[in-house]
């Protein structure tokens, strides 16, 4: 029989929030009796935006903004029905994007 696996990808702009969420997920999965691999930190996406400070002229005066997207990967191997129920009832912060693949 093939092993079942749940793959959870987390994305957030704040690394503290994503680490707390990952720890909650890992703790919940381990408590329910599943094997957990992770959280694995994936490369951080960095988007840099450059704008001109003045409205009409002074092209040499520019300002740069950046937006970092932190990502984590968690694999849950051999999940039990209890694991799935516990993960569905888990409350996570609103700043975390969760993508689950079975």
From Swiss-Prot:
Part of the 30S ribosomal subunit. Belongs to the universal ribosomal protein uS10 family. PANTHER family: 30S RIBOSOMAL PROTEIN S10 FAMILY MEMBER. This is Small ribosomal subunit protein uS10. One of its GO terms (molecular function) is tRNA binding. SUPFAM superfamilies: Ribosomal protein S10. Involved in the binding of tRNA to the ribosomes. InterPro entries: Ribosomal_uS10 (IPR001848), Ribosomal_uS10_CS (IPR018268), Ribosomal_uS10_dom (IPR027486), Ribosomal_uS10_dom_sf (IPR036838). It comes from the Bacteria. Keywords: Ribonucleoprotein, Ribosomal protein. GO terms for biological process: translation. GO terms for cellular component: ribonucleoprotein complex; ribosome. It holds the Pfam family Ribosomal_S10.
């Amino acid at each position: 029989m093939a092993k079942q696996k749940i793959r959870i990808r987390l994305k957030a702009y704040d690394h503290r929030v994503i680490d707390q969420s990952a720890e909650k997920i890992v703790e919940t999965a381990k408590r329910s009796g599943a094997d957990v691999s992770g959280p694995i930190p994936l490369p951080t996406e960095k988007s840099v935006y450059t704008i001109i400070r003045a409205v009409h002229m002074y092209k040499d005066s520019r300002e740069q903004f950046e937006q970092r997207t932190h990502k984590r990967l968690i694999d849950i191997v051999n999940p039990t029905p209890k694991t799935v129920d516990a993960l569905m009832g888990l409350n996570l912060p609103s700043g975390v994007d969760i993508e689950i693949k079975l």
